[in-house]
């Protein structure tokens, strides 16, 4: 597919930055937004779903929403230093850890040690742990006590494709969201908007074929309840 010359990868350029940007996850977005408005924020969020469904993207949106200096009603749409830093993974109070490469108890203990200090510039210190099911048993045990009784300023956001590999003691202490597969019609409209904005030279029939292939890939991805 030909697009105008652009130094920024389209997947990054059009990555959702707010809850309103998400497609196919309206219930999740509304539930989280309402709970934040009501000041009923869980100690930990747990997002489950197939690869590429948007777990890490939503995790960052949650982190931005919790720490947006313009408030929840703004929905991160007005320029905010906290939101910009979180979006670029540069915020000192929002740490992301890939549990696929950092599985050990020492990695978790480093997080716990860091959690002892309050946030520097944001309202909450937030730890986003991707592929959390990859943590070792010892790492989960080390994490559990902090998860049970975290300081008020600390929030966890977990993402996983393998919910069954996470100890029930951890799952039970999270607010869990199972992300839905995106409908083909919604995906088509999303890609078409990008094509139009980028003046892409591709027909709607070709776009439908791309969506069909993407849907087949997602169907082949097993669902893990």
Regions found by a protein language model. Give the residues of each.
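A short helix-loop-helix "switch/interaction" segment in the helical subdomain of ASCE P-loop NTPases
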Residues: 205-216
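P-loop/Walker A NTP-binding region and its immediately flanking N-terminal helices
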Residues: 1-176, 185-186, 204-205
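Aromatic/hydrophobic pocket-lining residues that form π-stacking "cages" and hydrophobic walls in ligand
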Residues: 59, 191, 210, 219
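Residue-level detector of conserved catalytic or cofactor/ligand-binding positions
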Residues: 215-225
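Conserved small helical "lid"/interfacial subdomain of P-loop NTPases
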Residues: 183-203
């Amino acid at each position: 597919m030909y697009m105008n010359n652009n130094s920024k990868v389209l997947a990054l350029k059009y990555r959702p930055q707010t809850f309103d940007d998400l497609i196919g996850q309206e219930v999740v977005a509304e539930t989280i937004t309402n709970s934040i408005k009501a000041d009923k924020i869980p100690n930990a969020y747990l997002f489950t779903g197939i690869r590429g469904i948007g777990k890490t993207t939503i995790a960052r949106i949650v982190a931005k929403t919790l720490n947006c200096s313009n408030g929840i009603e703004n929905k991160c749409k007005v320029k905010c230093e906290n939101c910009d830093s979180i979006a670029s993974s540069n915020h000192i109070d929002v740490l992301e850890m890939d549990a696929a490469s950092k599985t050990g108890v020492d990695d978790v203990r480093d997080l716990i040690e860091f959690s002892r200090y309050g946030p520097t510039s944001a309202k909450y210190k937030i730890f986003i742990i991707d592929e959390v099911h990859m943590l070792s048993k010892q790492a989960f045990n080390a994490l559990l006590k902090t998860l049970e009784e975290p300081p008020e300023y600390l929030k966890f956001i977990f993402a996983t494709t393998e919910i069954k590999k996470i100890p029930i003691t951890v799952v039970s202490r999270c607010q869990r969201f199972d992300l839905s597969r995106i409908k083909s019609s919604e995906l088509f409209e999303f890609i078409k908007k990008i094509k139009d904005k980028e003046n892409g030279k591709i027909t709607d029939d070709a776009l439908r074929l791309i969506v069909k292939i993407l849907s087949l890939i997602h169907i082949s991805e097993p669902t893990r309840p």
